[in-house]
Structure formats: C-alpha cells, structure tokens
Amino acid sequence: STKNYKKRLIQLGESPSRVYHVGAICNDNINNIKKFSKKRLEKDIGFKFKKRNIIVTLHPETTGGQFTEKKIKIFFKTLSKLKNVGIIATYPNIDAGNQLILKYLEKFAKENNNVKIIKSLGAQNYLKSLKICDGIIGNSSSGLLESPLLKKGSINVGLRQKGRDTCGSVIDTDFDSKKIYKALKKIFSKKFKNNCKKVKSPYIGKNVSHKIYKIIKSQKVQKLRNDKVFYDLR
C-alpha cells in the first residue's frame, strides 16, 4: 500500500519482482463516493452537522502495555470540552477492552447533547461524513488512510497505529489531556486546514482494485510456490 511497505517486504527476503506497490484499497472507495447533499446525509445518519464537526473512533490498544481505564477517561473528558462542535462517535472494534470503551462512550454521549453515537456508518456514509467534518480523532487506521486522502486532519492518540506510515496531516499525541486539547485546537485552525490540502498521502493510488486483480491474474501460482527463495539485499 506504500513504497515504504514494499521496501520492508523486500528486506524480509521477498524478491523485488514479486512485490508491487499499488496504493491502499480505500482509494477506490473514495473515488466511488456517490454525489450527495448534506441535508440528505443528515437525514440518513440522524445527525445535524454544526459549523465545526469531528469523527471520534477509539479502539483498544493491542500493543505498548496495558490499555488502562485512566486513558479512556482522559480521552473522553477532554472531548467534553468541545461544547460547540458536532461529534459523530462510532463503536470500537471487538478487541479485548472494547466494553470499557463503550461504557465511557455512552456516558460521554449522555452528558453531551452535541454527541451522536452511530454503531457503524458504513463505508459510503463514513466517507461522506468525513468530507463534511473537520477531521478525525482517536486511534483508527482511518486517521492515517482515508483522512489524509480526503485532505482532512486527524489526531492519532496512543500507540495502536505506531510504526505505520503517516504524513503531515496527522497529529500524533498520547493520552494526555493538554496535548489532546492542543491538537484539537490545531485541527480546527485555518492554517492547519490549508496545510492538509497540500499533503500527499503515502497511501495514494489509482484503480487499486483493478491493479491488484491484474497482478494476481498474471501470476502462475504453482510457479510462485516452487520458485520461492530468500532474496538477499545487495
């Protein structure tokens, strides 16, 4: 999905002739967004957009030590300061620790009338909502993939996405209230929004699905299986 990931696979011993860089598959989803009106989207998802809006998705961390209740509390308590911002919050995934996130997510929505919990927006409505919103906060891969491709800012909190390729529209921070709030102010700033428009995502690609299909179709599976050798870097 990126040139850097292609390089890493070759470093692991794969022959360069067998490794292809095509871009991330989400490029196709973005290019296939159907025309929509803001009013219709609001009706479809049951959410009234404000002047400023953000999408929130927090998943459990699977690396970097214990994903503590304290971190979750800090995250949602900081977001509670955004009184005049429309917040669309989606469910965490099913990794261990998701129930604790859900507990605080529901509490967060109950105490703040600018928050709308949507279990799953679906691919099309998610991308449409992101096009309207100012950006994303949390630790979803969408903050590294879809958000930069749509020229939107994202705040990547914690270690879940550590080690993945990123770009200038992504603000990395840990579970620290002051740092998160500082990042939030930045993501809504005119200067940062303008900078995001100039960012080139490392995941960019065209006709990704078709390229993958053509590559797979051109390969002889039995030959690939028999000719597998370790490639030494020169």
Which role does the model predict for each range below?
Residues S1-R234:
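Nucleotide-activated sugar donor-binding and catalytic core shared by glycosyltransferases
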